[in-house]
Amino acid sequence: MTAEKSGSSRRSFLTSAAATSAYVWIPKPVNGYKAVEMRPASYDDRAKPGVSKWELDTPALCVDLDRMERNVAKMQATLKQSGLSSRPHAKTHKTAAIAKYQLSTGSIGICCAKLTEAEAMVGAGVDRICMTTANPSVAKIKRAMAIRKNHPDFIQVVDYEHNARDLNDAAKAAGIVADVVIDVAVGARSGIPAADAPALAQLIDKLPNLKLRGMLSYDGGVQHAKGFENRKTRALKTIEPNVAAYEAMKQSGLNMEIFSGGGSGTYNIMHLVPHFTDLQVGSYLFMDMQYLAIGSESGDTVFNDFAPSLTVITTVLNNRFPNQMTTDAGSKALTLNTPTAGVIGEPGMTYNAGSDEFGGIRWTSPPSKAYQIGDKLELIVPHCDPAVNEYNQIYGTRNDKVETVWDVTARGCSQ
């Protein structure tokens, strides 16, 4: 199969995709490669830059670099136009090379959800990290302050009075003044209630080894709300108490230079929030089936603001049984999130990754071709964050050829 044939069939899914709750509709089929068409090569050869992504051993996690770069450029342009900045979450890609790319293209910092993730990122040369999860244990606080001692632009979130005092003690022991932001709750997952935030801010302002920088308010519950107008109404309503808390702290003379939050689902909404400074976007980089299903400002059917750039290549293992086949991408390759993975080019197929090692595909209408053992398919992942965490490498491709291979720097860093 020629590169031209391969490229035209596989690139078509971006321009025409529309999502349902289970899969993405793509009018032009992806014909795939037969096993006999694969270039004989060792695994090491297949992993090198320059080979076709269809020659990679599977399951293989791939990102189309052109699409990813366009996603980043669109996010940066949109936020710049609305007067906001991006502070993207590393928990999406867990990859130092991508974090550095985001910083080089205009992001003001990188968010980390877990301390080990932050340690992996700084160890790989990523700076300007904001730790968005409070570290309640003394051991973790000491480690966070160790990062701050060597990286003056490190910011730690705090949401309890005793946590602030512990941070102050650890910062004093390390001989530093640590930058902190307050996690002001939106919902009931984490953070301090908005009404109580000013008192915590006043305490922090009095602690000699802490410097208050502002507040975070991330509303995770609204990011996947179906329909743009519904999402907009909910996002603006739920953050009203937080805006009031921000204004109370600002009026009392406290330093409130940061008002951060939001996400990929509300990237074009948060500019309407008074005093907001930056967005903690993540999935915009890759997209996934969950986000494709939420709808956009142009219509509730599909979230087409950003292109799906992250895919998993999988191989057919069994085709003996009617209207179904088995592949090598199970829950360890895709996770168990819903909606399930979308089979690119095959709108009649539904994918079930319920088995650890195997994926099951069923269909009620004929596929675009009769798939044989060794044929490969391309999948849009259900949820990009946990899917990335299943892999050691991401293959960066351009025009269906591997251009770069990135180590997933913070894979497994969940502590």
Language-model features, listed with the residues they occupy:
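Active-site loop/helix belt of alpha/beta enzymes
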Residues: 5, 172-177, 185-296
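Conserved, mostly hydrophobic/aromatic
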Residues: 68, 91, 121, 182, ...
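Active-site anion/phosphate-binding pocket segments in diverse small-molecule metabolic enzymes
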Residues: 236-415
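N-terminal capping/small domains of soluble enzymes
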Residues: 55, 60-64, 69-81, 93-105, ...
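Glycine-rich tight-turn/loop motif centered on a GG-T
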Residues: 53-64, 128-131, 145-156, 226-236, ...
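N-terminal secretory signal peptides and thylakoid transit peptides that target proteins
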Residues: 2-21
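C-terminal segment of N-terminal export signals and the immediately downstream linker at the start
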Residues: 25-74, 78
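Active-site-proximal beta-alpha core segment in soluble small-molecule metabolic enzymes
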Residues: 89-224
